[in-house]
Amino acid sequence: AVTQFKGNPVLLNLWASWCPPCRREMPVMQAAQQQHDEVHFVFANQAETSDVIQHYLQTENLQLDHVLLDTHTELAQWVQSRGLPTTLFIDAEGNMQSYRMGELSAASLASHLQALQSSQSEIAH
């Protein structure tokens, strides 16, 4: 899924609507997504149905780009995530720059995104 975004940095967020920290960080993620056009935000829901996801997004008035269904939690297994939310920061070359398990505050997310973009500008020079 992430390979289609190669050439741009990617934030990959593993989440579920039943997860309180995931729910709290979603408005923060949406705001960051709107502020960072150069980063592709990908939201991989873990083991919920599309109906549940759509209902949650509509109820919370969230407009997220690239919401994926990971019905068998394959991504969580691949990154060996022990909890949700889990966020991966992937550079334009497809390499994971950092990994964070747990809720991200706006300040922490901004710091991770700045580091991701710094690695991007180093690649460009």
Protein language model regions, located:
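Nucleotide phosphate-binding site architecture
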Residues: T3, P20, Q30, Q97
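Short, conserved active-site loop motifs that form the nucleotide-linked donor/cofactor pocket
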Residues: V39, D65-H66
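Hydrophobic beta-strand anchors of alpha/beta hydrolase catalytic cores
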Residues: L11-L12, F41, T87
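Aromatic-flanked redox-active Cys/Sec active sites in thiol-based oxidoreductases
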Residues: N13-W18
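A short beta-strand-turn-helix
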Residues: A1-V10
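Thiol/disulfide oxidoreductase modules built on the thioredoxin-like
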Residues: Y56-Q63, D70-S121, H125
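Structural microenvironment flanking redox-active thiols in thiol-disulfide oxidoreductases
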Residues: R23-E60, T71-Q77
